[in-house]
């Protein structure tokens, strides 16, 4: 990737108002664009794919505020144990890759209680504000996405696991979150779809769920109504900055330069390939997840669920049922592992009745961007004024998308953001304080083959 520099005057002669260029049309990119456009800013959003093709479409649809990061005590040891098990919930393909080995070591060092406590303080502070923004956008723009704020269930199969499930829920109480413990009999009275094997559940009352693809399409339409220009099938090859080192736009693989007074990188797992040449080296791995969607299942749960022992998410959407889950860390662009899709219904059948009676209507696989310390990267890039990044949310991207977009939009406009997020500060990954002199030799942001969306409903 070549970093272009030009005289500052070349960039702004025709710009009647500040223009922001956003790379990535996922939930973080589009919510950033939405809030900027509502404030009267000119915005252009670029994406190599279509709106709703990535993780913002394919996620489980659970807006689970107070969600734990990946860096939990014991997770790294389990990951190493599962490394050679292709059917494990977390599968890491062994390979002689220096970046992966460095990521694994850093990840392991962060899987401790002290780090988790610090992360949770910040992640929990983002929870209620992000749902308020979801509800504001949905109400103002009239988005029909089956949004329901009725919590989610941690459904437990084995009676001996109920105590640990409840203990985990209690850790969120000091942060203002509530929960209810439900017996298996009560759960079946509420939703007869649960099998007799289920011992009970912990009901996280404050969260919500929605159809993420419908939300994304509605959000994209809202952005367009506000004047946001959205260009899909547009590959970004590199960033531009002026002679003073300020971000000044991007250039595409077609040789086109798109000018802007600010640039926001929200390209998911591909973000680091762009930010690295601007002095920000984010240690990120793509963790592929899968979903299957069914119609015709006789009875659906009354709200979204996570199945405690198998880590499968189960979400009702418009009278259909989505099964989502698994983490698969391996090189970008490798073929799907069909056994990972098969794991979803296999992991759900002991909990939910009638899945075998449903008709599969969609399947999907895509990457969740996972940082080595478990926290997202949100804010200004040190050493390059006008450059911002919002990436690395792992499985929290859909949930935290609106609050991330609000924080980024306020930063772009020079306004105080609604939250201070020191744990998510990009400065922790700055190369020599930022703005590296390394301008040559990086892989293009779109170098990996596209991940297809599979069958779409």
Residue ranges and their predicted role:
Residues 16-28:
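Beta1/beta-strand and adjacent pyrophosphate-binding region of the FAD-binding site
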